[in-house]
Amino acid sequence: MYIDITHYLTVSALMFTIGIAGIFLNRKNVIIILMSIELILLSVNLNFVAFSAFLHDLVGQIFALFVLTVAAAEAAIGLAILVVFFRNRGSIAVEDVNVMKG
C-alpha cells in the first residue's frame, strides 16, 4: 500500500481539529490548552513536511524545524509561567488568571 499526500493531510486535519476542540471544550485547565496549541502546531508541521516531500523541496522541512524550535520555546516559557503562577496562587485554573493584584 502506497501512502500518498492525502493520508498525511487527513491525519494533519484530524490533529488540527482535535487541537481546536481541546481549546474550545476545555477552557478551565491551562495545561490542556497549552497541549492543544502544541498539537495544532504539530499538525501544521506535518503539513509542511508532507508538502515538502510531495514537491521535492526542502524549504517546508526547514520551516518545520523553525516552527518546532519556536513551539519548544513557547512550551518552556508557558510552563515556567504556570509554575510561578501556581506557587503564588496555589491554582492554575483559567478563572484565577484574570484576577490580578495591583
From Swiss-Prot:
Top-level EC class as recorded in UniProt: translocase
GO biological process: ATP synthesis coupled electron transport
Catalyses which reaction(s): a quinone + NADH + 5 H(+)(in) = a quinol + NAD(+) + 4 H(+)(out)
Entry keywords, A to Z: Cell inner membrane, Cell membrane, Membrane, NAD, Quinone, Translocase, Transmembrane, Transmembrane helix, Transport, Ubiquinone
One Pfam family hit: Oxidored_q2
Keyword Membrane part of the UniProt annotation: yes
GO MF annotation, one: quinone binding
Primary residence: membrane
Bilayer topology annotation: Multi-pass membrane protein
Cell compartments where the protein resides: Cell inner membrane
Subunit structure comment from the entry: NDH-1 is composed of 14 different subunits. Subunits NuoA, H, J, K, L, M, N constitute the membrane sector of the complex.
Family, per entry: Belongs to the complex I subunit 4L family.
Functional note: NDH-1 shuttles electrons from NADH, via FMN and iron-sulfur (Fe-S) centers, to quinones in the respiratory chain. The immediate electron acceptor for the enzyme in this species is believed to be ubiquinone. Couples the redox reaction to proton translocation (for every two electrons transferred, four hydrogen ions are translocated across the cytoplasmic membrane), and thus conserves the redox energy in a proton gradient.
NCBIfam families (alphabetical): PRK05715.1-2, PRK05715.1-3, PRK05715.1-5
Protein name (database record): NADH-quinone oxidoreductase subunit K
Upper taxonomic lineage: Bacteria, Pseudomonadati, Pseudomonadota, Alphaproteobacteria, Hyphomicrobiales
